[in-house]
A protein has these predicted regions:
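Short, solvent-exposed helix-helix connector turns and helix-capping sites enriched
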Residues: 181, 209-210, 239-240
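TRNA-binding/sensing appendages of the translation machinery
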Residues: 1-101, 157, 161, 176-178
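Positively charged, Gly/Ser-enriched RNA/tRNA-binding surfaces
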Residues: 2, 35, 41-53, 64-65, ...
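Short, surface-exposed recognition loops or helix-turn segments adjacent to catalytic cores
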Residues: 174-185, 202, 280-287
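Short, conserved phosphate-binding/catalytic loop or strand-edge motifs used
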Residues: 137-143, 179-187
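Phosphate-rich ligand and nucleic-acid binding surfaces
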Residues: 30, 190-195
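Short Asp/Glu-rich motifs
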Residues: 69-70, 186, 208, 338, ...
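Acidic, His- and aromatic-enriched active-site or binding-groove loops in soluble protein domains
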Residues: 80-88, 193-218, 276
Length: 462
C-alpha cells in the first residue's frame, strides 16, 4: 500500500525544533511529561497483551559489536547505522539499528538448548540515519513480538492475530492490514533475469511503492516489455480474494510463484475464518524494506497517518546467518505513530489522577505522613508546603491545585476543630482531561474516610 512521507512528529508532546540551531539533533525526540506518561502506558498495555499470548519480554543492549551483528543486517542498513569506537577494545560499535537482528543473534548464540517454539517480546529504541528531506525519524520507539521455531500456518496467523488484538486492546478503532508474500514479487524479478544489483534496487523501489524508479530500473536492466509489465502490474495488485486469481495469471504456473500464492491464500483464508476479513487487504507488491524477510509479510495502516504504524513477517533464514537455522516470524509497532493514531480518535487516554496535599510549613511532618499514607493506597501524591495559614490556606491550596491541573486537593491545618479532619477541594475534569476553571467543590472529612473512599473508587475502577 502506498504511503506518503510523514512530517516530523510533534503530537507526542515533543519539543519543536527552532531552526538549524536546534538543541536536539534532527530526527530525535524529547517527549514531555504528559505525553511520556501516555507513551509508557501504551507500551505497557501492548506488552501486557503480548504476555497474555505467552510472549515473555527480553531486554537487549543498546550497543552491539559491528562485526557480530553485521551478518543479520543488509548493507544499506549498516550504512545508515550510527557507529562509534569502543574505547576499551577499539572495536566498532553499532547503536541499535534493528531489534529483530539482535534477537536472531541472541537466540543463535546465547540461548542454546532453549525449548522451541520461543515467544519473545520487547520494547526498544532503534536508531537509523535518514536524510533530512525524507522526513522520517532517526529515533524510533518500538514494541514488538517474535515467534521463533515455528514455520506452520498457525504461526503466521498467530503473529498477525496478536498484532490485531493488541491494536484493538489499546483502543485503535479502525485500521487495515496489508498482507503479502515476498516470494511472489521476488520470483517475478528472478524470472525477469535482473542482475544481483538490479534485483536489489528493484526490491528497494518495490518496498517504497516507487513506480517511476522501478520502471527506470527495469529499463536499465533491459527487461522485456512483457516481464516488466508483469512486475509493474504485480505492484498494483491490492484488494480482496480476487487478487489471488490475478496473481496466478501472472505466475504462469511457475512453482516458486504458485507456492508463494498458495501460502498467502491459506493464511488469508484462515484469518478470514476467524472474523478478520474486514481488516485484511491482499497486496502482491507488499515488500518490506529488510532483506531477511522471505515469506508472509504485512503492514498496518490507519486513517490520518501517512505511513505504516508497524509491520513484520516471516524470516526463516535470518537466525541461520548467526549459525542456527530456525524458522521465525514477528512484528514491530512504532509507538510514536500508534500514539498519533490514537490521538486522532481520543486525546484523553486514561492516566491515574494525582492528589495534591497542601499544608502550612509548620505541619511538614504531618504533610509527609499523610502523603505516605495515600501512596500506600496506590495513589499518586504531590505534596506542597505553603506559608499561608487559616482561611488563606484554603485559597492558596485551591490556586495550587488549579496551577498544577490536579482535580483533588487535600488541605491540612485549615483551622478545623479536629486535626484528624481535612478540607477536600475537587474540580470536575473537562473533556480534554484538564480541570480548567470548572466549579470548585469543598468538603470537610476525616482522613480515614477520605482514604476509604479512594480505596472504594480504585476497586470499582478495576
Amino acid at each position: 500500500m502506498a504511503s506518503a512521507p510523514p512530517t516530523r512528529r510533534l503530537s507526542s508532546g515533543e519539543l519543536a525544533p527552532s531552526d538549524e540551531h536546534s538543541l536536539v539533533p534532527v530526527g530525535m525526540a524529547t517527549i514531555l511529561p504528559e505525553a511520556a506518561r501516555h507513551v509508557r502506558q501504551l507500551e505497557s498495555e501492548l506488552l501486557t497483551c503480548f504476555y497474555r499470548y505467552g510472549y515473555d519480554e527480553i531486554i537487549l543492549p543498546t550497543f552491539e559489536y559491528f562485526d557480530v551483528l553485521a551478518p543479520g543486517l543488509e548493507p544499506a542498513l549498516l550504512e545508515n547505522s550510527y557507529k562509534i569506537v569502543d574505547r576499551t577494545t577499539g572495536r566498532i560499535l553499532l547503536l541499535r539499528p534493528d531489534v529483530t537482528a539482535q534477537i536472531a543473534r541472541t537466540v543463535a548464540m546465547g540461548m542454546l538448548g532453549t525449548r522451541l517454539p520461543l515467544r519473545l517480546s520487547y520494547r526498544a529504541t532503534v536508531f537509523r540515519y535518514e536524510p533530512d528531506h525524507v522526513g522520517r525519524d532517526r529515533e524510533l520507539f518500538q514494541v514488538g513480538a517474535e515467534l521463533i521455531g515455528a514455520d506452520d500456518l498457525s504461526a503466521d496467523c498467530e503473529i498477525i492475530m496478536l498484532m490485531i488484538e493488541s491494536l484493538r486492546q489499546v483502543g485503535l478503532p479502525s485500521f487495515k492490514i496489508s498482507l503479502g508474500h515476498v516470494g511472489f514479487f521476488k520470483g517475478l524479478l528472478v524470472r525477469a533475469g535482473l542482475s544481483a544489483e538490479g534485483q536489489k534496487l528493484a526490491e528497494q523501489a518495490a518496498s517504497r511503492k516507487d513506480f517511476p524508479w522501478l520502471r527506470e530500473i527495469l529499463e536499465r536492466e533491459r527487461v522485456g516489455k512483457r516481464s516488466a509489465q508483469s512486475i509493474l502490474n504485480a505492484l498494483e495488485l491490492c484488494g480482496k480474494a480476487e487478487v489471488l486469481s490475478k496473481g496466478r495469471t501472472l505466475a504462469q504456473g511457475e512453482q516458486p510463484l504458485v507456492q508463494a500464492l498458495d501460502r498467502l491464500a491459506q493464511v488469508y483464508e484462515l484469518l478470514c475464518s476467524m472474523g478478520f476479513q474486514d481488516l485484511l487487504l491482499l497486496d502482491l507488491g507488499e515488500f518490506r524494506g529488510f532483506d531477511y524477510y522471505d515469506g508472509i509479510v504485512f503492514d498496518v495502516f490507519t486513517d490520518g497517518i501517512g505511513i505504516e504504524l508497524g509491520g513484520g513477517g516471516r524470516y526463516d533464514h535470518l537466525i541461520g546467518r548467526f549459525g542456527r537455522d530456525i524458522p521465525s516470524t514477528g512484528f514491530a509497532l512504532n509507538v510514536d505513530r500508534l500514539f498519533r493514531g490514537l490521538n486522532l480518535v481520543d486525546t484523553t487516554r486514561t492516566v491515574t489522577s494525582a492528589v495534591l496535599v497542601v499544608g502550612p510549613v509548620t505541619m511538614t511532618k504531618e504533610l509527609v505522613s499523610v502523603s505516605r499514607q495515600l501512596r500506600q493506597v496506590g495513589v499518586r501524591v504531590i505534596q506542597r508546603a505553603v506559608t499561608a495559614s487559616g482561611q488563606d490556606l484554603v485559597g492558596a491550596a485551591a490556586d495550587a491545585g488549579l496551577e498544577a491541573d490536579i482535580p483533588t486537593t487535600i488541605v491540612m491545618g485549615a483551622d478545623q476543630p479536629n486535626r484528624e479532619h481535612v478540607v477536600v477541594l475537587s474540580r470536575q475534569q473537562m473533556g480534554d482531561g484538564k480541570t480548567g476553571r470548572s466549579p470548585l467543590h469543598r468538603k470537610t472529612m476525616s482522613m480515614s474516610d477520605f482514604t476509604a473512599s479512594l480505596r472504594t473508587d480504585r476497586e470499582g475502577a478495576s
